[in-house]
Amino acid sequence: MSHQPPTDTRQRYHPSLFRSFFQGSFPCSTACRTPGKRLDMVFSSGHDMLLEKDYAALAEQHLLTARDGARWHLIEKIPGQYDWQSFLPMVEAARRQEIEIIWELAHFGYPDHLNIWKAEFVEHFSRFARAMAQLMRDEGIERPFFTPVNQISFWSWAGADVAWFNPHAANRGKELKRQLVRASLAAIHAIRDVYPEARFVLTDPLVQIAHHPDNPDSKPYADAQHQAQFEAWDMLAGRVDKELGGSEDCLDILGLNYYPDNHWFFPDQPMSLDDPARVPLHILLAQCWQRYQRPMLIAETGAEGDARAPWLQEISENVAVALDQGIAIEGISLYPVVEYPAWADDRRSPGPLLGLADPNGNRNLHESLALVLRSQQIKFATRNA
């Protein structure tokens, strides 16, 4: 496999879509790991009690755009009735601190009274999206950004193929993917009825799935699995499964979630960081750009422990290469930007910029990551001048 970048004679791309190129993503999953046991990351990270301080801390680090989540399960506890007391303080605090938010409407969670497999799920989600958009318009929010459903592909696999979290199903991933696409499209249309100028960041993992050199017969299967990562975006764009209602104008901004372990050999063998088969990020970005010609955001990226600073350096260098090729990368968002007790195994998340809060509500800054962040912010500002 060639790792050489494609020839591109276009001028360097100058990002301008968001308030800041470097951004922060708050942990805001509300998945049920087991039936009846919901893990609310906005709560467990302390973010719900520290909104003002957290947004101010991002502003201090020049992270003026952030991804954060509306907790649908709290807002619509009673079918058709919306209680905004968990959400309005977020809107107000972000406005005071001048932080631009990309709002997630469903991050692996939904109200207990809904059955995700039923048509009513899509209908409720559409009404919720419309109500949320109307609330934000009433609050005077201009040029809003939304993510209707976070990581459709990952949720479909984790929730309906391997039963890792809700809806706790097996071998129904494609069915859930189609349902989540229906819900996303319904939300996009509902929000646009209120906010024609709204923009949508549609997130999913960006991965490389390759055949192992010792197993050349697996190449067609690896290639097929690699291509499957694009299926949800293709559905949203109406390129496949047209009966779902997708269209090209619904595929807006691609949100790419990218981590060190996003490379593996078919079917599930991890690929080491120094494996020669590993395709650099800028090549994966070029492939995505060639396929969709849409603006892209590295919507989540980060590494654990001492690797977090060099990882950001590597990501930034790859994104710089992509920008030089004329590829529309609009930002890099650090995840998690604040620490939380990890939802998969009850560890503390080891990769944040800001640690768990002390009794006074203060979070320690990870100095080496902050230094690399500041260095890259200066470099990218100079490049974009």
Task: Describe each PLM feature range.
Residues G69-R71:
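Juxtamembrane transmembrane-helix termini
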Residues S2-M49, Y55, A59-Q61, H73-A385:
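Non-catalytic scaffold segments within catalytic domains of secreted glycoside hydrolases
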